[in-house]
Amino acid sequence: MRSQDPSRRLSRRLWTLFALALCLVTGTVALAQTVPQLSGRPSPMQNTGADPLPRWIVDDIQKMRNYPDQPPVIPHSIEGYQLSVNTNRCMSCHRRELTEGSGAPMISVTHYMNREGQMLADVSPRRYFCTACHVPQADTRPLVDNTFKDMSELGFKPAGSGQ
């Protein structure tokens, strides 16, 4: 009878022991690994103070845009500006009729268009909340390295231009 062959029984025991040892070794190695830290912040269960607020850039100098159709950034303080359904403090300077007296740049004519491209007498409701697209700038260091290249740096360079 085959099932009573002692060498076969020994072989089955060896394979079982080998499988158990393999599971034990792999399980301990998997449990011993630590999860890599993606940031230097403490564990979420610890109470920590908030980082200080960044210093806003409020030099009133218009910044160059980084790409076509980028909304201009806000070069002045908007602290305390009321922006609600009933009031928009930005319009007191940037509305088309008031820019001559305020010296502020006029908002784009696209802000007076509805979704169908029809011109309106007043700012389109979908463009009324300025800070949805336009943001003030803060004096901070980048969170990640930036390898951005301006479009002019990516364009064609004639042979022999030395660049």
Curated annotation (Swiss-Prot):
Where would you say this protein principally sits, based on its record?
periplasm
Q: Which residues bind heme c 2?
A: H111, C130, C133, H134
Gene Ontology biological process: anaerobic respiration
Reproduce the UniProt comment on modification after translation: Binds 2 heme C groups per subunit.
Q: Which UniProt keywords apply?
A: Electron transport, Heme, Iron, Metal-binding, Periplasm, Signal, Transport
Q: Where is the signal peptide?
A: 1-32
Q: Which InterPro entries match?
A: Multihaem_cyt_sf, NapB
Q: Where is this protein found?
A: Periplasm
Which domain of life does the UniProt lineage start with?
Bacteria
Gene3D superfamilies attached to this UniProt entry: Flavocytochrome C3, Chain A (1.10.1130.10)
What does the entry list as the binding residues for heme c 1? H76, C90, C93, H94
Q: Name one GO molecular function term.
A: metal ion binding
Q: Which GO terms describe its cellular component?
A: periplasmic space
Can the keyword Cell inner membrane be found in this entry's annotation? no
Q: Does the keyword Protein transport apply?
A: no
Q: What does this protein do?
A: Electron transfer subunit of the periplasmic nitrate reductase complex NapAB. Receives electrons from the membrane-anchored tetraheme c-type NapC protein and transfers these to NapA subunit, thus allowing electron flow between membrane and periplasm. Essential for periplasmic nitrate reduction with nitrate as the terminal electron acceptor.
Q: Provide the assembly information.
A: Component of the periplasmic nitrate reductase NapAB complex composed of NapA and NapB.
Q: Which PANTHER family match?
A: PERIPLASMIC NITRATE REDUCTASE, ELECTRON TRANSFER SUBUNIT
Describe the family membership recorded for this protein in Swiss-Prot or TrEMBL: Belongs to the NapB family.
Q: What is the protein name given in its UniProt record?
A: Periplasmic nitrate reductase, electron transfer subunit
